[in-house]
Amino acid sequence: MSYLEKPFRGIDFFIDTVQDLKSMKKEDRPPVLVYGDPDIDGLVSMREFLLFLEKELKDESIPYYVNNNRSHGFFIPSEKLRGYYVFCVDFSIEQDKMDELVANGVNIVSVDHHECQETFISSYEYEEEEIKGTITDSDGAFGFVINNQYPFEDPEWTFQSGMGVLYHCIGEYYRQVYDSTEYLDNKTTRALVGLTLLSDVRNIEMPEARQFLDALYTHPNEGYIGYLIESVLSKDYTFGLPCMDRNFVDYTFSPKVNSLFRFNRKDLACAFILGYGYPLEDYQTLQREFVEYLEGNITKKEYPNITFIEIPSTGLSEDEKSYVTNFVGLLASRYVTSSNVVIAYYSDDGVYGRASFRGSIQSIDFRRELNKLGLDGRGHASAYGILNFQPSEQLFESLNKRCTELFADVKEEVIFRDVPHLSLWIKTPSKGYRTSKENCYLLNHHRIYLRYTGDLSRIEKKRGNDRYSIYSVDGIEVKCFNNELTFENGLILPMLEKGRPVLQLARFIDE
């Protein structure tokens, strides 16, 4: 276990602001609001912020706010928040927006992890060192952004999620105010950081990230983590003690929560993360059915290293049109490969709406590079939204050319091991268990696969339908969710699930 040696810039302001509010009587204290982002990282960190402020300010009535339509940013009109202290987490506030808010008497404490400008984002009437006073009137409003992405911050911690940056802020608060590392050492808190690293697709291969994944994978699954797991389990969940492992997060937990946001059920998502249970309706199934319908109408324009997907409004009801743009990023993700990125965009009678970019290689800053060609991408390096996207042949050609150049510098090879007998391989701990466990700590495009080189006549299909197949190979179960894959053209992915190796025929050899 290791701590952040040098606190992020602005944490001292964070501590002083909370201490200032804490020193006031409740009836004299200015109104406080916690503003979260509409995704798993945003809600988990919003809950953590609420718990922290409720405890420190001895006030269990602090309100929160989350945007509709999975919109990322600060959208509450500033005139409605004059005199407020707004604690924001997991979304960007740029310098111009900060200046506007502060000029209108709104005090802002922002904790973020998205790419940002090179200089510290702050705005206040007084000199920097004077921000440490109790400033509650509109003339003395102030705002600042704590962010691990500033170039002056420790690069070893750039992987952190919004919850991760907040973890350091609150942990440093307790260390300085109470001389305690209990919060920093708390396994559930660290597990929540690990959960958001996975849900937000952060660079989990960075050395400092592993401790948070360890906390998640080895958590006893009690208390709040246990609640999250049990709430999203389906009735047909198979045997074995459920746990928040990589596959569970990727294929059960994240889809369950994200589907609520996509159908504009943010209130249900907030209620779930805040501890009030998951809704009875199966939104994950509704999501799959809606995506399949959308895929029946999309138009793809494919280039060597980039695919453009137009999602038309064809056949959609007015209600469906109100949330279809929330599915753009998901559709883009379904067509990404190790050598291909995707831009998906919505169109309604010639008017273009939300667009999203998705790529699988985090070592390339696609957002920065493609923004140089005229895009207005907002978000992370390889997963972000695009504002005011206007498709054209000229734009497509220029983006394809740049993506081809970017991929030319990437030496990504699929790592796989030839395995002649699955049963012997999986029962050898140094092979089966170790490889399956290590894959839980690797980015998708760095995972280790298996190529079956044994006797194909020993493979028996046990059951399946048009969506999946389950095979027995040397007496070992192998699942497959793409019926175009075979053991001749595909590779097997070993992962740990419920503490034991599981196998899935997961990708084409030449993909």
Residue spans for each PLM region:
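Beta-strand/loop nucleic-acid-binding surfaces
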Residues: Y471-F487
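Structural detector for short beta-strands of small beta-barrel domains
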Residues: L442-R467, N489-P494
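Short, glycine-/small-residue-rich phosphate/pyrophosphate-handling segment
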Residues: T158-H168
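Flexible glycine-rich surface loops and low-complexity tracts that mediate binding to linear polymers
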Residues: L485-A506
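Extended, charge-rich, solvent-exposed interface segments
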Residues: I509-E511
